[in-house]
Amino acid sequence: LGYARKVSEIDYPGYGYYQNAKGAMNRPFTPSYMDQITCWELARDRILAIDSALEAKVTSILIMGIMLTAGKLAMLPAADRRKNAQYIQICRDKLKQELQVSGAYELLSGGYRLKAKLFAAVPGLYLYGYHFRKYKD
């Protein structure tokens, strides 16, 4: 956010992107994917310094980032998920902490609410189910 002095929130309900066959979305998890969480934590700190009323909104986005990272971990083979258990634990710990922010959970879509609650409660089951749901085709 550099030297930003103002933050604006818009009502646009979606986004668009180009699916790059060689892009990050198609690559397996590496520890650098944890940077997505760190970047949103840093962005939140900067945004809240400008407008504290956006805490729930920006935290809901951080929660989605945590769940996207957990999804990357879920796509790994079971042996690799075990090798990356520390990152799974970090995601779970951060998720449980962020779910405590008033209003953040309520701003999530129904799908993200379900995913977040399941991953926070039983991460192994969530990762197993996510892995096999994606590979069933």
Pin down the residues of each PLM region.
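Nucleotide-sugar-dependent glycosyltransferase catalytic core
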Residues: 6-39, 76, 82
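Noncatalytic linker/hinge segments flanking ATPase motor cores
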Residues: 31, 48-59, 108-116
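C-terminal, non-catalytic tails of nucleotide-sugar-dependent glycosyltransferases
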Residues: 38-57, 97-105
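Secondary-structure edge/capping motif, primarily at the C-terminal ends of alpha-helices
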Residues: 47-50, 72-78
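Short, charged, amphipathic alpha-helical segments
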Residues: 55-61, 84-89
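Amphipathic alpha-helical repeat scaffolds of TPR domains
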Residues: 59-73
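Membrane-interface aromatic/basic loop that binds lipid-linked glycans or pyrophosphate carriers
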Residues: 76-137
